[in-house]
Amino acid sequence: MKTYNIVIASDHSGYELKSKIINYLEQKCLNIYDCGTQDTQTVDYPDYAKKVVDIIIEKAAPIGILISDTGIGMSIAANRSSEIRAALCNDILTAENAKAHNDANILILGAKSVDNKIVFNIIDKFLTTKFEGGRHSTRLSKIK
């Protein structure tokens, strides 16, 4: 199976933001796998959350990004798997803590709630922050 740096998907309401994010990440020479959707026709977000989750569980990509209107439904759908730690992040601090303290492996963005002026900063912080381990590992073991 081919491996990727990042797997990404959105529902119809996140399609435009997803397209911008893919362009941004490709400029950074990252290998992106786009699981859809490919237009703004109405689709069901759980189907796209499952695609990203399955790819991460299969270890074909270490990080995922999911986008819907608020991100709440995507968060619920993605977090149904015990191997997934999906975090809804609408600011830089939340993205940093999601990785540093919770070892999040999926970044969830709300297309209607995230500030487009900082969305790339949020993504960069999520991608570059390392898990701190230590007491955070102990806490994570309690929720597996």
Curated annotation (Swiss-Prot):
The keyword Isomerase applies. Keywords: Isomerase. It holds the Pfam family LacAB_rpiB. Its EC number is 5.3.1.-. InterPro entries: RpiB (IPR004785), RpiB_LacA_LacB (IPR003500), RpiB_LacA_LacB_sf (IPR036569). Coiled coil: none annotated. The active site is at H101. This is Putative sugar phosphate isomerase RP299.
